């Protein structure tokens, strides 16, 4: 069994495309294929919005690695290896940013699972130049193309989706970049959680903050709290910062791979935990979030989360806290509460 994800395996079949190139790897890359690629091209850089992957790849001195929502550093890259992201809007964002940064005559290789919608590259790349499929294997596709047209100027501010949401008497302006959970909408789970929350105090962590809806609402409704917001996704970090700023709020927003960069003295942990990784369901982060939560709380710390009702979270919470209460429930979502004892 290969150590590489299927899109990397199809790229591995076509190594001659990378000969003599300075390659910038971007998108939904999850494995260490970029380290192998070093032997087949002039240089490799990795640009990722995934903090967990960044923590892994940055330990190697074979490649330069960058984490963020915008690639705004000097580079000698003349080819992009794009792992097709699950959100089409994120693919459009990455193409606009990277083609503008690297310019005319930049070559591009695009790899991804067919179910991810990679076929969209055929229309999406037309404004930059020709692109064509050259290989299919493992239910994946391999495209190669070249940017022959002058890309339009790229300004990240143009890519924010801005929308208003109202809860009771509170209203909020939300700023969201492509690739962020619930991009451009107020999801029902978060709404139910906010409607159920008690009065908050002390240091509060919004874990998996997305566009900052939970954290900003909590800060607005509880002006005396010290709000902290974390996410694994760089687009979420930038979006949450923009949401706070748009509403005249302040708080600490930072990247964290579950609890890797958090404090250990939260009075409240509030979350709409993620359970998707790429195109697949992945409960690992949520299980660690719930199971390890007491270690990152004050003596009387409390945790309140929303989850799809079919997810088996109560036993995990019960094991960690020795208690778990359902505060609210619909036919789709449940609000779970636990207190450190």
From Swiss-Prot:
A GO term from the CC aspect: cytoplasm
Keywords recorded for this protein, A-Z: Cytoplasm, Methyltransferase, rRNA processing, S-adenosyl-L-methionine, Transferase
Enzyme class: transferase
Entry keyword annotation includes Transferase: yes
This protein's record includes keyword S-adenosyl-L-methionine: yes
Molecular function, one GO term: nucleic acid binding
Main location: cytoplasm
CDD domains reported in the protein's UniProt record: AdoMet_MTases (cd02440)
Catalytic activity from the UniProt record: guanosine(1207) in 16S rRNA + S-adenosyl-L-methionine = N(2)-methylguanosine(1207) in 16S rRNA + S-adenosyl-L-homocysteine + H(+)
E.C. code: 2.1.1.172
A Pfam entry, by short name: MTS_N
Subcellular location: Cytoplasm
Subunit structure: Monomer.
Family: Belongs to the methyltransferase superfamily. RsmC family.
Role played: Specifically methylates the guanine in position 1207 of 16S rRNA in the 30S particle.
Name of the protein: Ribosomal RNA small subunit methyltransferase C
UniProt lineage: Bacteria, Pseudomonadati, Pseudomonadota, Gammaproteobacteria, Vibrionales
């Amino acid at each position: 069994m290969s150590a590489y994800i299927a899109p990397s395996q199809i790229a591995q079949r076509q190594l001659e495309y990378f000969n003599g190139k300075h390659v910038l790897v971007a998108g939904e890359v999850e494995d260490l294929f970029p380290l192998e690629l070093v032997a087949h091209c002039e240089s490799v850089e990795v640009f990722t919005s995934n903090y967990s992957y960044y923590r892994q790849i940055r330990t190697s001195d074979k490649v330069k690695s960058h984490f963020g929502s915008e690639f705004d550093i000097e580079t000698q890259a003349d080819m992009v290896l794009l792992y097709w992201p699950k959100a089409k809007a994120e693919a459009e964002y990455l193409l606009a940013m990277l083609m503008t940064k690297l310019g005319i005559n930049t070559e591009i290789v695009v790899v991804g699972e067919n179910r991810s919608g990679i076929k969209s590259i055929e229309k999406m790349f037309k404004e930059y130049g020709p692109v064509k499929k050259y290989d299919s294997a493992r239910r994946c596709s391999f495209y190669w193309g070249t940017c022959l047209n002058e890309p339009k100027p790229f300004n990240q501010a143009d890519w924010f989706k801005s929308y208003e949401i109202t809860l009771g008497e509170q209203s909020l302006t939300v700023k969201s970049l492509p690739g962020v959970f619930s991009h451009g909408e107020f999801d029902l789970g978060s709404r139910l959680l906010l409607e159920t929350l008690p009065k908050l105090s002390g240091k509060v962590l919004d874990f998996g903050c997305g566009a900052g809806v939970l954290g900003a609402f909590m800060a607005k409704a509880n002006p005396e709290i010290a709000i902290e917001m974390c996410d694994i996704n760089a687009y979420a970090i930038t979006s949450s910062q923009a949401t706070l700023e748009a509403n005249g709020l302040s708080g600490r927003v930072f990247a964290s791979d579950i609890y890797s960069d958090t404090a250990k003295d939260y009075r409240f942990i509030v979350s709409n935990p993620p359970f998707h990784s790429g195109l697949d369901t992945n409960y690992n982060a949520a299980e660690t979030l719930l199971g390890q939560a007491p270690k990152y709380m004050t003596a009387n710390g409390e945790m309140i989360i929303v989850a799809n009702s079919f997810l088996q979270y109560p036993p995990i919470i019960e094991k960690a806290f020795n208690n778990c209460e359902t505060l609210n429930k619909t036919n789709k979502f449940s609000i779970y509460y636990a207190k450190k004892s």
